[in-house]
A protein has these predicted regions:
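Non-transmembrane alpha-helical segments in soluble domains
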Residues: 75-78, 123, 139, 166, ...
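Glycine-rich, flexible loop segments associated with nucleotide phosphate handling
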Residues: 9-16, 26-32, 100-111, 131-140
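C-terminal catalytic core of tyrosine-transesterase DNA break-rejoin enzymes
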Residues: 113-148
Length: 178
């Protein structure tokens, strides 16, 4: 993953396609996500902790390791918070719409929470007070693609439109902080 500027000086988070879940040859371009001014400010002001020469924003410095913060660390944190909440309310942090193999509600995941929160916000223009964003643009922001037709015609992402969505999302996410 890499943070870089485009030709107009706008910041992007770029993930090479080969590192993405969808690695189809029908999607020839890397995943680019425009960064909102709030995201850029957060990244610029986040102290770099770790080891000399580290380029990692959130390094794993546990037990002397010098690597990136992992999904497993986040999963373990969510599991601990779930267990603590479950002792309080008997339920914990579960998604009632998602079931495990035994039919019980699954513990929430960072991936699911983040995507569901973004998609709910992006769909509800009236409720959240932003411009309405078309479904295909919301899906593009989530990197959801229907290979059978979309990939045949989409040669690149609509970064200008996506930037508008992510700028509004940044405003919403930071609206209670400033």
């Amino acid at each position: 993953d890499e943070i870089q500027k485009d030709d107009e000086g706008n910041w992007l988070h770029v993930i090479p396609r080969e590192r993405m879940k969808v690695k189809s040859e029908k999607i020839p371009f890397d995943r680019k996500t425009p960064l909102s001014p709030q995201a850029v400010e957060l990244l610029e002001n986040t102290p770099r902790i770790g080891f000399h020469g580290s380029h990692l924003i959130f390094p794993n410095i546990n037990k002397g390791k010098r690597s990136a913060f992992t999904r497993d660390a986040v999963r373990a944190l969510i599991k601990r918070m779930h267990d603590k909440q479950r002792k309080i309310d008997g339920i914990g942090w579960v998604d009632p719409d998602q079931k495990d193999r035994t039919g019980k509600p699954r513990i929430v995941t960072l991936h699911g929470c983040a995507r569901a929160t973004f998609n709910t916000w992006a769909k509800d223009a009236r409720g959240y007070g932003h411009k309405a964003f078309p479904r295909d643009l919301r899906e593009s922001c989530l990197d959801h693609r229907n290979e059978s037709y979309q990939c045949a015609y989409d040669r690149e992402q609509a970064l200008g439109d996506m930037r508008e969505v992510f700028d509004a999302w940044g405003e919403f996410c930071f609206s209670e902080i400033k």
